[in-house]
């Protein structure tokens, strides 16, 4: 595996130098899915600490997370209301400073912890209870001491670029009972009113800003622990953002909501997809030296060593729908989109110490793939989808993957591997034959171990599998209904999306001899 030839003199060389070019093996999961004895109904920042310990003990060196940004009332981590702010729902309540001064605190925490026993994350109950608790905590334990809190004052100053707009936006959202921006009166959307709005909603702005300070402290603690235990945290920075977001409201010159982003027609969708997300004004971003992206990356590097860029092709060209329903690529000239993508990604590489990994699934022009390799940016390889589609549709041998890539059996938007095997027996049989493995309609533990091990032996430098695909090795750790193991089904509106919960607690997993034995078997000898 000669990754150095791709990375040594690339614009990403400084990031590779920090993490090294030895093969890396990891797990991939949403934070909201895990729970410990201290969790309050949903995965929390400090729950990552026992997960890091488990990973180090087992031999994993990467934990990949879905986006951790504040999503407001939405549950999708890819529909955030801020490109920077973290989600206060992930705060570890039991570890907040001076929490013992809250009346009946033990009972309140226990009531929220019991929500971890539901089969999936109950966002309605979790949000109701956690937000009520956070407001009580702020009023009784924090508000009176803010003026003398020098660390908080420094945080307000250092993060003012995004924090004051976010705090003000959140305060107005609360005042407007969650109404979308396009339903706000003009007095709340005119930019010249922003200083007055920050003053008008001063108390609420401080509340939401202080929650971000707490999120920052807890996730920094997690990052420090991960560094000490030689485990890389891989974040996820979505390229697109909700039109009902702080960024579109405040940094409006960087976006256009009159047109929207989507995907062109293909074999699976003859009409294409309209994601109803605003497009970037790349010329204005460039004019301001990409400060919006630079600030976003600067803050994220406090928490991550590596980060996923979903839909990385979008930095080169986007499929744009106009108001009449016509779609086209912008820019559509290869010379123009290669120039644009190279400029933006080179700027992003220079803006932080983190290493980006591109989600380059689907139809990607060869010149884009070549450019990503020259930049030292990894792509993504999913063995069941990696075929010579332009010729005989044969599976591509895992040993032939570009070393500058991450191999993963499944994604948060796909069936789990066991679910795919059950639902697509014809393809699964072909895949088993390709790997020289026996085929049975129900995926056996032995075959799944073999396939997981082969995924870790691919030519890719990164091997990061969905945590669900490891848990499936033990029937007692997953639902009998495999559909419940799926994280998201794109194009559907369902409470099942983004509510997946890992059944056992992390404490239970740590002492599960059979499960840990299987993991050891998969990783031994790599």
Swiss-Prot record:
Molecular function (Gene Ontology), one example: 4-alpha-glucanotransferase activity
InterPro entries reported in the protein's UniProt record: Glyco_hydro_77, Glycoside_hydrolase_SF
Cross-referenced Pfam families: Glyco_hydro_77
Any one biological process term the GO annotation gives: carbohydrate metabolic process
Catalytic reaction equation(s): Transfers a segment of a (1->4)-alpha-D-glucan to a new position in an acceptor, which may be glucose or a (1->4)-alpha-D-glucan
Gene Ontology terms: cellular component: cytoplasm
Domain of life: Bacteria
Top-level enzyme category: transferase
Protein EC: 2.4.1.25
Entries under PANTHER family matching the protein: 4-ALPHA-GLUCANOTRANSFERASE, PTHR32518
Family listed: Belongs to the disproportionating enzyme family.
Name assigned to this protein: 4-alpha-glucanotransferase
Highest classification ranks of the organism: Bacteria, Pseudomonadati, Chlamydiota, Chlamydiia, Chlamydiales
């Amino acid at each position: 595996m000669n990754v150095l030839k791709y990375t040594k003199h690339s614009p990403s060389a400084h990031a590779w130098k920090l993490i090294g070019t030895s093969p890396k093996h990891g797990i991939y999961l949403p934070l909201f899915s895990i729970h410990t004895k201290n969790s309050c109904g949903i995965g929390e920042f400090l729950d990552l600490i026992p997960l890091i310990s488990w990973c180090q003990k087992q031999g994993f060196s990467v934990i990949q997370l879905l986006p951790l940004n504040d999503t407001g009332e939405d549950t999708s981590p890819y529909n955030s209301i801020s490109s920077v702010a973290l989600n206060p729902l992930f705060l570890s309540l039991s570890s907040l400073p001076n929490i013992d001064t809250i009346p009946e605190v033990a009972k309140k925490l226990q009531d929220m912890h019991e929500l971890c026993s539901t089969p999936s994350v109950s966002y309605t109950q979790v949000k109701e209870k956690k937000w009520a608790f956070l407001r009580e905590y702020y009023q009784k334990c924090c508000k009176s001491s803010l003026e003398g809190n020098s660390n908080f004052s420094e945080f307000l100053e250092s993060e003012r670029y995004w924090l004051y707009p976010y705090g003000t936006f959140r305060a107005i959202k609360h005042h407007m009972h969650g109404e979308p921006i396009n339903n706000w009166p003009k007095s709340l959307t005119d930019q010249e009113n922003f200083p007055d709005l920050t003053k008008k909603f001063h108390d609420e702005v401080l509340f939401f800003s202080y929650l971000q300070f707490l999120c920052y402290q807890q996730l920094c603690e997690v990052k420090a622990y991960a560094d000490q235990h030689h485990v890389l945290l891989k974040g996820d920075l979505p390229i697109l953002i909700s039109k009902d977001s702080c960024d579109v409201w405040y940094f409006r010159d960087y976006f256009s909501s009159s047109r929207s982003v989507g995907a062109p027609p293909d074999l699976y969708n003859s009409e294409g997809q309209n994601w109803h997300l605003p497009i970037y004004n790349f010329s204005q971003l460039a004019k301001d030296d990409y400060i919006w992206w630079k600030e976003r990356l600067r803050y994220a590097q406090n928490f991550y060593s590596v980060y996923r860029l979903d839909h990385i092709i979008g930095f080169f060209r986007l499929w744009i729908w106009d108001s009449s329903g016509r779609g086209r690529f912008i820019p559509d000239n290869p010379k123009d989109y290669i120039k644009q993508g190279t400029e933006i990604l080179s700027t992003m590489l220079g803006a932080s110490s983190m290493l980006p990994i591109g989600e380059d699934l689907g139809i990607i022009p060869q010149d884009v793939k070549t450019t990503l390799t020259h930049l030292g940016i990894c792509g993504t390889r999913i063995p069941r989808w990696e075929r010579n589609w332009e010729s005989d549709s044969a599976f591509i041998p895992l040993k032939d993957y570009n070393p500058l890539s991450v191999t993963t059996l499944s994604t948060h938007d796909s069936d789990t591997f066991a679910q795919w095997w059950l639902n697509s027996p014809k393809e699964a049989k072909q895949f088993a034959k390709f790997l020289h493995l026996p085929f049975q309609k129900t995926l056996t533990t032995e075959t799944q171990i073999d396939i997981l091990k082969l995924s870790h032996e691919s030519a890719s430098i990164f091997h990061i599998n969905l945590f669900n695909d490891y848990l499936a090795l033990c029937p007692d750790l997953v639902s009998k209904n495999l559909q419940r193991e799926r994280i998201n089904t794109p194009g559907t509106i369902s409470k099942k999306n983004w509510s997946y919960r890992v059944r056992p607690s992390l404490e239970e997993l740590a002492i599960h001899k059979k499960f840990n034995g299987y993991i050891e078997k998969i990783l031994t000898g790599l």
